[in-house]
A protein has these predicted regions:
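Short, residue-level hotspots on alpha-helical faces of the histone-fold
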Residues: 20-24, 28
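Short acidic/polar alpha-helix capping motifs at helix-coil junctions
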Residues: 12-14, 24, 58
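Hydrophobic beta-strand-centered segment that forms part of the acyl-chain substrate-binding groove
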Residues: 27-63, 67-74, 87-93
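Short capping/connector residues at structural and topological boundaries
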Residues: 12, 18, 53-55, 112
Length: 135
């Protein structure tokens, strides 16, 4: 539930708070797959876009899915949804890197993605790939 301490000066969910929760959700999703929280290191938030205001008293939930893997990187698409309507209110992508907990150096994670479940997941994967194309 969105409380007063989560708000910005406009009276809506503060983006920094939304991003913090998005990163936490991403970490939980990856940790469930990878299994070693000590071996995960946050690398980047690629975007976090609001599609509608999130207001005090709104009940929301985050839903994340791994949409891209590199040798050591793992990218998650996270959506922020309205609990009552399931309407997407915001979304973003974050990337973590698998590391050796003792050395902090990147190590292969071994995560292999299944085939996309639907066209929406295909779009999410394509968007995630676009963040890694050399410009």
């Amino acid at each position: 539930m969105i409380r007063m301490e989560h708000l910005n000066h406009h009276g809506n969910l503060y983006a920094g708070q939304g991003i913090e929760w998005m990163i936490e959700n991403s970490f939980i999703v990856i940790n469930c797959e990878y299994g070693d929280p000590q071996g995960l290191l946050y690398k980047n938030t690629h975007k976090f876009d609001f599609y509608s205001s999130v207001n005090p008293g709104d009940i929301v939930y985050y839903e994340g899915l791994i949409v891209r893997t590199g040798k050591t990187s793992i990218t998650i698409r996270v959506g922020l949804y309205d609990e009552k309507t399931d309407i997407l209110r915001a979304e973003g992508f974050t990337t973590f890197v698998s590391v050796d907990p003792k050395t902090g150096k990147p190590v292969p994670h071994g995560i292999v993605l299944d085939e996309p479940a639907d066209e929406e997941e295909v779009r999410w994967r394509e968007e995630a790939d676009s963040y890694f194309k050399k410009k």
